């Protein structure tokens, strides 16, 4: 059923991981123990839309587990405390060396192997492990209640040991919401602002999901680019950092304002079969209309009903100035498709870190959510392989690489500094100054 199960790793490689998990089932095991075995095996598929989820009862009880009271950042393979919710509240900025006697390198390796992500892209997995670090310590390693943590001071390099008492996850979420509202995920689709006497337009796109009742995404984009035209901006900075995707068509529509000739966005959408046999385990049965499908010679099917298929037209008013795009490992799915097309058409300069989605497309679209009958562990299985239209030569298992790599420090995060944005602003100002001189 999975649309691209062997897209990045061979059958032998994936089978080996599932065989290892099966071999470990040589004794009685509870649902959480089974989840710990299954999750790395599923992650070996290397698909960012494919994952094992906790049973619903364990997921609900997780809110009351006593977990490590830190928010962390993974930076170049090292783990730093970003927010400290422990009793002393004085450890932010420290580097974690070990937890309960386990070296942090081993912890990160174990958690990363269990994290879903496209291909061989480390930036996305680093972000996802960092976001869910405290939860993963429990669900994958069983660490809870009491934590013996060894820390390194980044400046003095001295080591200190701390006995940290776990706190309920629910309380930690509430503390984060109250103390650090700036850390919370934004639900905005788009925000437009201007700098340098309106010579620089800044388009912040947090996701491709429109929640406004009185406007659709197409209208919002059109009005935004009309405003950019009316203010005669010379440089456009587009920020899709931590944009995990949304509506496919909005990514294509955004790209259509950056180009002035017809273009192809998707080459093909394919599925393995027109009939699925796992309905008894699925939350909702999958039913694809026959008129949407066209049989292929290899036994698969082309999916025909999608607005991003076929020749696409540019949108007006097209922006013809310089484009700078801020990216990171959280730029995924719909935003990754947009980034591939911009990159393949040489339409922008990229700043930040490698994007989170594989260059030639992902496996997503229609999904099956399966619940395993004995453990109630759930599996998310995407059915559709997306093939982006591009002749650009690129590693299939990697994302878009930045022209200007920027690596943040833990102090950047704590102090709220944004070096990617500052660099983009500097480049935009330099570009505008050169234009004026000419």
Region locations from a protein language model:
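Conserved acidic, small-residue-rich alpha-beta core segments centered on
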Residues: 94, 248-416
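Flexible, low-complexity junctional segments that flank or bridge functional domains
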Residues: 1-236, 240-271, 279-283, 359, ...
